[in-house]
Swiss-Prot record:
Its EC number is 3.1.21.2. Gene3D superfamilies: Divalent-metal-dependent TIM barrel enzymes. Zn(2+) 1 binds at residues 70, 110, 146. This is Probable endonuclease 4.
C-alpha cells in the first residue's frame, strides 16, 4: 500500500496530541498547525514538547514525510505593502523553524493575495522573493505552495501562478506544491470524469510537474465548478462526487505523499479514511 491518507487533526493542548488524534482515526498521515493559526506569534517549543512529539511520531509508525504542517492563515508573502510583508515573512520563518525542530520536512502554505493593490505578476514575484529569503535562512524544510480556489484576490488558483512562483525560487530542491481537490475544482479544473481528470492533471504535469507534488488535500466541494468559492464538503456529498477520489487512490503519481482530509465533519474522518482505502484496486 503506497497511499498515505489522514486528516488535518487538532494539536490542542500540545503538538504531540496531533499524533494521537491521527492514530484514533486510523490515519497513515496527518496535517496540523504547530501554533495557533489565528495569531502572529507563539511561545517557543520547549525540549520536552519536541521530545514528546518525536517519540509519539516514532511510536505511531507515521513517517515525518507523511506529516504536512500548515502555516498561519494570517501570513501573506505576496502582500503589496513592505511592512506587512516583512511581518508575514518573520512569522513564516518562525513556522519553518518550528517544523525543523519537530523533525518535519515540509510546510504547506497559501501563496498570498495582491489585495487589488498590485498586479498579479508583482504579487507572485513578492511570494518568490519571500520564499528565497526564508530558504536562505533555514535548511531541511521544503516550502509547499497550496493551490487556491481564487477567492477574492488570492493567487495560486491557476497552475501558471504556481509555476511562476517556482520559476523564481532559487533552491528548487526545497519547493513543492500541495493540490487541494476542492480548490482545483472551484478554480475551474474539472476532475469529475476520467477524461476530465486526465486532462486537468495532464495540464498540471505540463505546467508545474509532478516532481513538485508533495501533498494533497482531499476534499469535496459545496461550491459549483469554476465558482472560485472555497467551501469544502464531505466526500461524495458535494459537487465533485466519489469517482474523483477513486481515481486518486489508484493513481501512482499520488503515492508516498500525505493525502489529507479537510472535510467538514471530523466525526466521520475515520469512515472517510476507510472509504478511500476501500477504493484501491
Amino acid at each position: 500500500m503506497s497511499k498515505f491518507v489522514g486528516a488535518h487533526v487538532s494539536a490542542s493542548g500540545g503538538v504531540f496530541n496531533a499524533v494521537e488524534n491521527a492514530q484514533k482515526i486510523g490515519a497513515k498521515a496527518f496535517a496540523l498547525f504547530t501554533k495557533n493559526q489565528r495569531q502572529w506569534s507563539a511561545k517557543e517549543f520547549d525540549s520536552e514538547t519536541i521530545d514528546k512529539f518525536k517519540t509519539a511520531l516514532e511510536k505511531s509508525g507515521i513517517l515525518p514525510r507523511h506529516v504536512l504542517p500548515h502555516d498561519s492563515y494570517l501570513i501573506n508573502l505576496g502582500h503589496p505593502e513592505l511592512d506587512a510583508r516583512e511581518k508575514s515573512l518573520d512569522a513564516f520563518l518562525d513556522e519553518v523553524q518550528r517544523c525543523s525542530l519537530l523533525g518535519l520536512d515540509r510546510l504547506n502554505f497559501h501563496p498570498g493575495s495582491h489585495l487589488k493593490k498590485i498586479s498579479e505578476d508583482e504579487c507572485l514575484a513578492n511570494i518568490s522573493e519571500s520564499m528565497n529569503r526564508v530558504l536562505d535562512k533555514t535548511s531541511g524544510v521544503s516550502l509547499v505552495i497550496e493551490n487556491t480556489a481564487g477567492q477574492g484576490s488570492n493567487l495560486g488558483w491557476k497552475f501558471e501562478h504556481l509555476a511562476q512562483i517556482i520559476d523564481k525560487v532559487e533552491d528548487k530542491s526545497r519547493v513543492g506544491v500541495c493540490i487541494d481537490t476542492c480548490h482545483m475544482f472551484s478554480a475551474g479544473y474539472d476532475i469529475r470524469t476520467r477524461e476530465a481528470y486526465d486532462k486537468s492533471w495532464g495540464e498540471f504535469d505540463k505546467i508545474v510537474g509532478f516532481k513538485y507534488l508533495m501533498g494533497m488535500h482531499i476534499n469535496d466541494s459545496k461550491a459549483k465548478f469554476g465558482s472560485h468559492v472555497d467551501r469544502h464538503n464531505s466526500l461524495g456529498v458535494g459537487e465533485i462526487g466519489l469517482d474523483t477520489f477513486k481515481f486518486i487512490m489508484n493513481d501512482e503519481r499520488m503515492d508516498d505523499i500525505p493525502l489529507i482530509l479537510e472535510t467538514i465533519d471530523d466525526s466521520i474522518w475515520a469512515q472517510e479514511i476507510r472509504l478511500l482505502y476501500s477504493f484501491v484496486n
